[in-house]
Amino acid sequence: TAIGSPHVISLIVEKITNNKILFPNIIDPTVDILDVANIRFGKGNVICAKCFISCRVELGNFNLLNVGVAIGHDSTIGDFNVIMPNVNISGGVSIGKENMLGVKATVLQYLKIGDNVKLGANSLLMRNAKNDNLYIGIPAKLMRL
């Protein structure tokens, strides 16, 4: 899943899904998982070097966590998300499916990100993000497409 488009990843998986094909999680050995016993991973995830995953985190299927991503406690991430380098996701965050979080973006604690949301590079999300929208800036604001 090292493809930078959440939608393209979902289309590829849809076309090649087959009971005879396994999709392992690929986790770099430098990834720091705080509480292995209380983490749930789906399938087909790619977790790159120097990521940090705290306790009680749920990660769905076919997500890409690029270099240096940090995920806080009690967070849930759905399917087909692309999270770019050095993104910080605070504790208690809920992220839907097919989202793109730009380089060095930050999501504050207990926020919800819907589906098909794009969060711009270096943006600071301080409010919930609704489906099918683009948010940019500090603080991140809804941009009209």
Regions found by a protein language model. Give the residues of each.
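Short, Lys/Arg-enriched, disordered terminal segments
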Residues: 18, 143-145
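Structural signal for interior beta-strand "rungs" in well-ordered beta-sheet cores
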Residues: 26-143
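Short glycine-/acidic-enriched loop or helix-start segments at secondary-structure transitions
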Residues: 8-12, 129, 145
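Phosphate-bearing ligand-interacting subdomains
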Residues: 1-32
